[in-house]
């Protein structure tokens, strides 16, 4: 039903993208089906759902973005991300992983509004280069065997850490996260939507691919990194005055929570991590879309100036509240279901983990509620274009589409 709703929107606004959507969707109805010879293979429902999410995000960008150059860059980036989800060996995975950086860099440098965009591009390139060269080191040390390997290989703990460093940068985990707020603040709205909704999923999907090589003995290191990212990142959100920076740090906390789910290495933890990927993809895309609409109308991203802004439109206020409540994991959103599964898994492993997760949830709910109350209370503006906000309706439906569970169970 949701797919038909979205396709009807595409048919109404951009008929050529309706054709593109239907052609791509016809490829996605097959599971365990290789339509690219030895190089591309659909081997999991998880990656099929991520590809569907990519197409939904592209759809809202196609409908809402007026700049044709940004549209072309968005289509290139989504195509690269789709190919990233379905390669059959590590070398192709790495190639498309690095290739995804260039459209975002062009968007930031070409269409950013402030001179600080050069500094944020330096951060992005430095982190990408610093964290990706170790991957090439492992590649050469393996005597090029990674070219033909279908993800199931046995390596030492040290080699796994080096291999996962490039994916950790795209998560990003807390200590490799400094490029993300800078890139979000300087990027145009379209680039921020793609960066939060798609590019962060490349790191999680890549880590999910190599997870079979993770040593069970050293999980404590990853659990510690995940908890530090959750707690410190959520406290960073509390002290932000820029709404876009707050949404960026919120992505850092959610990705740390996702890392906690992944390293448990159980079937239910994999299911919860994929659902959390989907929930964060839809939610963060809408967060940056709404913040971008606020910026385009008022000329500011400061939370102080958001006071009463969304109360000028009832539809906008409801949508804003729904998105940020979903971001904090309120039922019946997909975020709640995935986070509930993560909490259940962590309680089975150690009761003491619940204290850390409780702190994370309290702080996370606080900054989401603070942003909602600060934006809805007070005297409202009257110059807001409500029509554009209606484009986000399909993503809201997907964000609360709890029937994703039926795919896994």
Curated annotation (Swiss-Prot):
Please provide the Gene Ontology terms (biological process) for this protein: aerobic respiration; electron transport coupled proton transport; mitochondrial electron transport, NADH to ubiquinone
Topology within the bilayer: Multi-pass membrane protein
Q: Which reaction does it catalyse?
A: a ubiquinone + NADH + 5 H(+)(in) = a ubiquinol + NAD(+) + 4 H(+)(out)
Short name of one Pfam family for this protein?
Answer: Proton_antipo_M
The consequence of residue 20 to W is: In strain: PB306
* Main localization of the protein described in the UniProt heading: mitochondrion
Q: What class of enzyme is it?
A: translocase
Q: Which InterPro entries match?
A: NADH_UbQ_OxRdtase (IPR003918), ND/Mrp_TM (IPR001750)
What is the recorded phenotype of mutating residue 70 to V?
A: In strain: PB306
Family, per the entry? Belongs to the complex I subunit 4 family.
Question: In UniProt terms, what function does this protein have?
Answer: Core subunit of the mitochondrial membrane respiratory chain NADH dehydrogenase (Complex I) that is believed to belong to the minimal assembly required for catalysis. Complex I functions in the transfer of electrons from NADH to the respiratory chain. The immediate electron acceptor for the enzyme is believed to be ubiquinone.
Instruction: Give the protein's recorded name.
Output: NADH-ubiquinone oxidoreductase chain 4
The taxonomy runs: Eukaryota, Metazoa, Ecdysozoa, Nematoda, Chromadorea
């Amino acid at each position: 039903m949701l797919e038909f709703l979205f396709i009807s929107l595409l048919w109404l606004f951009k008929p050529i993208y309706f054709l593109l959507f239907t052609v791509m969707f016809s490829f996605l109805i097959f599971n365990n089906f290789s339509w690219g010879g030895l190089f591309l293979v659909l081997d999991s429902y998880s990656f099929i759902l991520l590809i569907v999410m990519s197409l939904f995000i592209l759809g809202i960008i196609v409908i809402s973005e007026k700049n044709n150059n940004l549209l072309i860059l968005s289509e290139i980036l989504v195509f690269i991300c789709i190919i990233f989800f379905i390669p059959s060996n590590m070398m192709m995975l790495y190639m498309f992983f690095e290739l995804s950086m260039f459209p975002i860099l062009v968007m930031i440098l070409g269409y950013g509004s402030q001179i600080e965009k050069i500094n944020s591009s330096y951060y992005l390139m430095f982190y990408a280069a610093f964290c990706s060269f170790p991957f090439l080191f492992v590649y050469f040390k393996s005597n090029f065997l990674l070219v033909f390997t279908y993800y199931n290989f046995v390596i030492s703990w040290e080699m796994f850490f080096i291999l996962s460093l490039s994916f950790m940068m795209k998560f990003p985990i807390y200590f490799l996260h400094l490029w993300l707020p800078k890139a979000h603040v300087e990027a145009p709205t379209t680039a921020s939507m793609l960066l939060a909704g798609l590019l962060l999923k490349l790191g999680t999907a890549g880590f999910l691919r190599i997870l079979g090589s993770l040593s069970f003995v050293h999980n404590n290191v990853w659990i510690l990194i995940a908890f530090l990212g959750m707690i410190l990142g959520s406290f960073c959100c509390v002290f932000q005055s820029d709404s876009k920076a707050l949404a960026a740090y919120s992505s850092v906390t959610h990705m740390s929570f996702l890392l906690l789910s992944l390293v448990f290495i159980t079937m239910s933890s994999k299911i919860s991590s994929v659902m959390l990927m989907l929930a964060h993809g839809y939610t963060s895309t809408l967060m940056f879309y709404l913040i971008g609409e606020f910026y385009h109308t008022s000329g500011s991203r400061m939370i102080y100036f958001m006071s009463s802004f969304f109360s000028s439109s009832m539809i906008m206020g409801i949508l804003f509240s729904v998105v940020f409540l979903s971001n904090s994991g309120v039922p019946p959103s997909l975020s709640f279901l995935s986070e509930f599964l993560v909490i259940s898994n962590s309680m089975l492993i150690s009761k003491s983990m619940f204290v850390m997760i409780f702190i994370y949830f309290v702080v996370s709910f606080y900054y989401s509620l603070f942003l909602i109350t600060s934006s809805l209370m007070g005297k409202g503006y009257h110059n807001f274009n409500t029509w554009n906000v209606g484009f986000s309706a399909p993503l809201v439906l997907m964000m609360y589409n709890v029937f994703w569970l039926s795919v896994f169970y």
